[in-house]
């Protein structure tokens, strides 16, 4: 991973996308700072990873907003995308197993990470939700599992960027850019944002 010239907790910018990487097994959950809805959702999960992810998310956003974690004003769009009410930056998050990722920028954005695991039914999955060109790339690839996860994380990130589910049609008038992420070898990830005259830089931060 390249050297990072940007400090963690820098003021969000449209020139940067800050990516906070979290080992959920190394952090603690604090149910007291979660919303009622978050606590109810946490109770439905067998592991505490959801609660830890929301705890860390609120702690980071609170530090950027100069608010206590429980005071962070998180709202949910009709499509399910979280946003900060009345604030000038956006965030998106994803977690898989013990790994979490929180993306922050002044740009609208979507992020997805997945654990890399061989998928025997990858083509069947792809044909349900992916465009024909993505399916063709998977079929033609020597390492089709690798390409499947590239295409899947791109699909998720792009749809999350505009607050849509993966079965929803994307508006062709909305031009999106994306980048594959530099992550541990067992992970694949992607972040997407609306097309910009200047491509934003990615800054990686480890949460310890």
PLM region spans:
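Core catalytic alpha/beta fold that binds nucleotide/phospho-ligands
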Residues: 1-208
């Amino acid at each position: 991973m390249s050297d990072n010239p940007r400090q963690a907790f820098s003021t969000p910018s449209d020139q940067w996308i800050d990516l906070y990487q979290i080992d959920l097994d190394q952090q603690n959950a604090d149910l007291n700072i979660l919303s009622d809805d978050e606590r109810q959702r946490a109770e439905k999960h067998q592991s505490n990873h959801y609660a830890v992810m929301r705890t860390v998310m609120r702690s980071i956003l609170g530090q950027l907003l100069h608010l206590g974690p429980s005071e962070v004003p998180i709202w949910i769009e009709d499509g399910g995308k979280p946003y900060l009410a009345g604030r000038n930056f956006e965030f998106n998050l994803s977690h898989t197993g013990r790994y979490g990722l929180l993306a922050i920028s002044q740009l609208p954005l979507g992020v997805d990470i997945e654990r890399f695991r061989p998928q025997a039914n990858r083509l069947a999955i792809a044909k349900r939700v992916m465009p024909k060109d993505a399916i063709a790339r998977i079929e033609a690839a020597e390492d089709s599992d690798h390409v499947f996860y590239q295409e899947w994380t791109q699909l998720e990130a792009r749809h999350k960027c505009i607050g849509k589910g993966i079965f929803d049609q994307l508006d062709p008038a909305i031009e999106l850019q994306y980048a594959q992420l530099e992550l541990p070898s067992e992970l694949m990830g992607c972040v997407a944002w609306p097309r910009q005259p200047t491509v934003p830089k990615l800054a990686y931060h480890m949460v310890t």
